[in-house]
Amino acid sequence: MAIIGIFFGSDTGNTENIAKMIQKQLGKDVADVHDIAKSSKEDLEAHDILLLGIPTWYYGEAQCDWDDFFPTLEEIDFNGKLVALFGCGDQEDYAEYFCDALGTIRDIIEPRGATIVGHWPTAGYHFEASKGLADDDHFVGLAIDEDRQPELTNERVEKWVKQVAEELHLEEIKNA
């Protein structure tokens, strides 16, 4: 089993593609990818490092598979778990709700002990509001807009994965 579990929910395939991009950069020996629709509580509990991919739909709603999984998520003890979040949203058509689902999932896992890493700068995005903010200048995780800024996705993912790997001291973990 890989040391990192990447779990995603996706209707259009965008968040799944991001999850696979992240896995490719980290390496299949380091990270495995799971569709949350086919995952269990035990699947998440098996990993001490989690990368959770959640898109935002319409007016700030979580993707339906994640929404269905939230009650299970609420049963997990996240103490000792390191978690990085990533998600897709549309900063133009849904500017008041851009990547809100990042905040929704954070609000579930953080009170249950999760240590969240991978905050991402808001610079370069054009939105009105987001529940996915860690502070005025950062999202709680990587925000991707495949609708309005697909040309920035590869660079954003690459930089974020490097940042998260450093925050997790991944080289030390892999060599232990």
UniProtKB/Swiss-Prot annotation:
InterPro entries found in the cross-reference section: Flavodoxin, Flavodoxin/NO_synth, Flavodoxin_CS, Flavodoxin_lc, Flavoprotein-like_sf
Cofactor(s) the protein needs: FMN
Gene Ontology molecular functions: electron transfer activity; FMN binding
Keyword Transport: yes
Regulation: induction: By low iron conditions and by heat shock. Iron regulation is mediated through the fur protein.
Keyword Kinase attributed: no
Pfam family, one: Flavodoxin_1
Occurrences of domain Flavodoxin-like (ranges): 4-165
Function, in words: Low-potential electron donor to a number of redox enzymes.
Name of the protein this chain belongs to: Flavodoxin
The organism of origin for this protein: Klebsiella pneumoniae
